[in-house]
């Protein structure tokens, strides 16, 4: 075992004592959240050393010591893979989680169960690190299900709210659909490869192995909220803001993308899977960007921006560039966590107001939050030399140089322009203009537990992209050899979106209210997908379920077959077989008519 492998194992093992302490002593002291935050900060600092050593040595390591189970055909062991993906992702995840933990000290200060909240966040992080470092498909599945169940517990944290419970159930149901694909791939590889080790799976795979790849794609679509399985992502905003920040930056939603990145050698020579991934990602990134344009909830705007960026990562995998997709995961984590934390700061200071139409003028009252929100939005839009630029620019350049994706490239460029548009709209409505919130609102952002994490992530949003791209292997960004007009494409579409948003804001600032267009309803109602899937189809199912028993059981069984039918048959049979009516008095009276007639005739 190499030195950096030992140090990485030590760093990750240090996350376990807080969990064990919480299990042994449930009645924890008030210092438990600070203890967890300090542990994660220390783990982040320790993890920098093995990551630096890995960059210098460029030597992958697999740790496999403990055998779980052995059958007649398969040996299942606990195995960790420390390669480029895991060694780069671990410090990023720890840094972002450290900032979110410190932010939670301020945001969740009045929550009576804050100790349990921090324990859940820590388990959430550990399950994601298990997923990232797993060198075994079953072990990866444990991390996969771990982030799923922890997201359910954290989204429904405020369990007294009906919307939070509904959102949590929605998240777990949509992820169960994706898990069907994962279990299908698990069973297929065990049947055909007799192993869950990625090395053996890749060695024995052929280009015709379509079934497990479709399973992986379905799993990634469910976990990373691609079109069709996306409604749980904006609904997850019902959870606390620190949960949204951790969920969208470095844990659950990128797990699906990471699954495809980890097993990209299986799909890189399969054109059908590449095409499906490319098309799914392109449609998702455009649909999410269109939906974000008309949202008024600040957290949902950021949530749809996450969905759009996940679609962009899928596009990158679809053009066979998994390393670029991973780079975008790492850069995206910094500014996305910061955007959610800035949103949480604004919401908390405005007494839980999330409608951007009721904000405005926050630039002067909340200067640090406003500055960080602007930097994060510009990084999201791909502004040059911010963190997001280093990955988005390379993705668009690579897509430009690919000759098989003109349709997907066009959609991706449109979505990139829309990203700039809704980011600018959020900045203008939230930070500029006249204040539209109650005048007695007490705004205060002087708490260090609020300022320090936002400052750290702001620095990350400024410089992390430069540091990561200049320290990955190869040690520097390759020289670009494409024409100038293609190189300027990313900047061009970003500028186009910015100008579009400014122009729309200027044109519509003093207009009278008109009835919205159908396109506005399409965007604002999320493409009518929730109404169709969550209202119309369940209503149709309930109506059908009601009518079938009513018609089949009540009407047919009761009226056509048994009691009423028997009585009808008896009445019909009695009428048919006899003319007797049972009228005894009438029968006796009929005997007197002939007698009376006879007497009359005689006389």
Curated annotation (Swiss-Prot):
Q: Which GO terms describe its cellular component?
A: mitochondrial inner membrane; respiratory chain complex I
Q: Name one Pfam family in it.
A: Proton_antipo_M
- Database matches in InterPro entries: NADH_DH_su5_C (IPR010934), NADHpl_OxRdtase_5_subgr (IPR018393), ND/Mrp_TM (IPR001750), NU5C-like (IPR003945), Proton_antipo_N (IPR001516)
Membrane topology per the entry is:
Multi-pass membrane protein
Catalysed reactions, semicolon-separated:
a ubiquinone + NADH + 5 H(+)(in) = a ubiquinol + NAD(+) + 4 H(+)(out)
Protein location? Mitochondrion inner membrane
NCBIfam families in the cross-refs: NDH_I_L (TIGR01974)
Family classification: Belongs to the complex I subunit 5 family.
Tell me the protein's name.
NADH-ubiquinone oxidoreductase chain 5
State the organism of origin. Answer: Pan troglodytes (Chimpanzee)
Please state the gene responsible for encoding this protein. MT-ND5
